[in-house]
């Protein structure tokens, strides 16, 4: 597994596999020297991820693929951050959490170069209903002035914990499937790219450093990751101005915590939102607030 990865992925594999971590650089690219040391005949699967919409270096992917021919391991490709940039590269299997991209209460996708067979699965209706309730409460808090912040956050936390412990596979809900069919993917791509370009052009604060400046034509950003020395103070400052940002990820295992790059990212990285809900006026407001941070 990549050393910089969320706890839910580690937990998923830890139950049945011995995990070895390979290192990433500060721009979240795979360190070739590190993965070279890890891949041998004992490896049954290699998990790769493309972070924040930026694809891993093609030469590294080619190297992993060449090693696969020698050692016959499977490649699992996490496209949760990159599915709109590119659906697949070298993976035998791809996985993506669609609810990270779209305003839906549930839904993910598993796809493969191989034919997949699955048992008949049903919806998890109770959980979906609670998440829909939380989404509505969040909207009322953000846009209607309703004092329900603690209420919606409590539901989200409870449902995320339940999802982490879930063993059974459920079908995507009918409401999420319907909402996905209503999405204009081309418009979403254009909006995200436009917002990324505006932030990159207008950000002017030496305390807030973009993780990278990606300019490739096919790149569709997941969010706008930045590094800030006083990340927690910066996040609180943004919240005071109604800008809510995600942080990634607390490191859980001893091996992960011993890697310097991991801890620097965990302590200092934050994602500025730029998804399709927001237009250039929103970006202008956010960048003005960010630039005023002292």
Which residues does each predicted region cover?
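Short, acidic/turn-prone active-site loops that include or flank metal/cofactor-
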Residues: 4, 23-28, 81, 98-102, ...
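Short, well-ordered alpha-helix to beta-strand connector turns
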Residues: 16-17, 43, 91-92, 105, ...
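PLP-dependent aminotransferase-like
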Residues: 1-72, 76, 82
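Structural detector of well-ordered beta-strand residues that form the stable sheet scaffold
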Residues: 20, 76-78, 95, 211, ...
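Short glycine-/acidic-enriched loop or helix-start segments at secondary-structure transitions
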Residues: 9-11, 31, 57-58, 85-87, ...
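PLP-dependent aminotransferase class I/II
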Residues: 5, 47, 118-294
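Conserved active-site segment immediately N-terminal to the catalytic lysine
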Residues: 74-111
């Amino acid at each position: 597994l990549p050393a910089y990865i969320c706890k839910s992925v580690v937990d998923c594999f830890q139950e049945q596999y011995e995990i070895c971590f390979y290192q990433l650089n500060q721009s979240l690219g795979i360190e070739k020297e590190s993965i070279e040391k890890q891949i041998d005949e004992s490896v049954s699967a290699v998990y790769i991820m493309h972070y924040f919409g930026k694809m891993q270096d093609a030469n590294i992917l080619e190297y992993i693929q060449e090693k696969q021919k020698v050692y016959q391991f499977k490649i699992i490709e996490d496209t949760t951050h990159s599915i709109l940039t590119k659906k697949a590269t070298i993976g035998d299997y791809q996985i993506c959490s669609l609810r990270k991209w779209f305003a839906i209460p549930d839904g993910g996708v598993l796809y493969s170069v191989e034919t997949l067979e699955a048992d008949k699965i049903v919806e998890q209706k109770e959980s979906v209903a609670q998440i829909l309730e939380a989404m509505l409460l969040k909207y009322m808090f953000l846009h209607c002035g309703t004092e329900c912040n603690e209420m919606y956050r409590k539901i989200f936390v409870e449902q995320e914990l339940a999802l982490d412990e879930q063993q059974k596979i459920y079908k995507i809900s009918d409401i999420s499937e319907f909402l996905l069919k209503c999405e204009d993917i081309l418009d979403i791509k254009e909006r995200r790219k436009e917002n990324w370009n505006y932030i990159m052009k207008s950000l002017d604060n030496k305390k807030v450093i973009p993780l990278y400046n990606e300019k490739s034509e096919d790149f569709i950003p997941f969010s706008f990751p930045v590094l800030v020395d006083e990340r927690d103070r910066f996040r609180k400052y943004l919240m005071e101005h109604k800008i809510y940002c995600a942080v990634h990820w607390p490191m859980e295992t001893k091996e992960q915590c011993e890697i310097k790059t991991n801890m620097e990212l965990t302590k200092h990285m934050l994602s500025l939102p730029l998804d399709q809900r927001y237009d250039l006026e929103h970006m202008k407001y956010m960048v003005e607030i960010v630039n005023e941070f002292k």
